[in-house]
C-alpha cells in the first residue's frame, strides 16, 4: 500500500510492504499464543505443587509419631512441682511523676 501526501512543496511517501502488513496482522495471534503458553505453564506448576503437597501430607501421616520430649524440671528446686505464674501488680500510688 502506497500513500502519497503533499505538504507544501514536499511529497512524503509511505510504503508498507506485504511483510510488514502480515506482521502487524499476526502480532495479536503471537500475543495470544504467548498468553496460552504462560497459562499452561502456571497450570502445570500448580498441579505439581498439589501432587507434592499430597505426597508430603501422606508421608507425615504415615510416619510413626515420636513421643514428646520430657519437660525439663523447674529451675527452682524448692518449687516442688507447683508452678505458679509470676504476677506483676501495679500500684499507682508508688509511681513518682517528676513535675516541672
Swiss-Prot record:
Keyword Protein biosynthesis: no
Region (Disordered): 58-100
Record keywords: Cell membrane, Glycoprotein, Membrane, Transmembrane, Transmembrane helix
Bilayer-spanning residue ranges: 29-49
Record's note on what induces expression: Up-regulated in Schwann cells by EGR2 during nerve development and after nerve injury.
GO molecular-function terms, A-Z: structural constituent of myelin sheath
Tissue specificity annotation: Found in the peripheral nervous system (PNS) Schwann cells (at protein level). Expressed in the PNS, primarily limited to Schwann cells.
Signal sequence interval, chain numbering: none
Regions of this protein lying in the Extracellular compartment: 1-28
Residues on Cytoplasmic side: 50-100
Compartments, as annotated in UniProt: Cell membrane
InterPro entries xrefs: NCMAP (IPR038940)
GO biological process, any: positive regulation of myelination
Membrane association type: Single-pass type I membrane protein
Posttranslational mods: Glycosylated.
GO cellular component term of the entry, any: plasma membrane
PANTHER family: NONCOMPACT MYELIN-ASSOCIATED PROTEIN (PTHR35974:SF1)
Function, in words: Plays a role in myelin formation.
Protein name: Noncompact myelin-associated protein
Annotated organism of origin: Mus musculus (Mouse)
Amino acid at each position: 500500500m502506497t500513500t502519497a501526501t503533499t505538504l507544501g512543496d514536499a511529497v512524503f511517501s509511505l510504503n508498507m510492504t506485504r511483510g510488514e502488513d502480515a506482521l502487524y496482522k499476526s502480532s495479536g495471534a503471537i500475543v495470544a499464543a504467548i498468553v496460552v503458553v504462560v497459562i499452561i505453564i502456571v497450570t502445570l506448576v500448580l498441579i505439581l505443587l498439589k501432587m507434592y503437597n499430597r505426597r508430603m501430607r501422606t508421608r507425615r501421616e504415615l510416619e510413626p509419631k515420636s513421643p514428646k520430649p520430657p519437660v525439663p524440671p523447674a529451675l527452682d528446686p524448692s518449687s516442688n512441682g507447683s508452678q505458679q505464674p509470676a504476677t506483676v501488680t501495679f500500684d499507682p500510688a508508688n509511681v513518682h511523676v517528676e513535675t516541672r
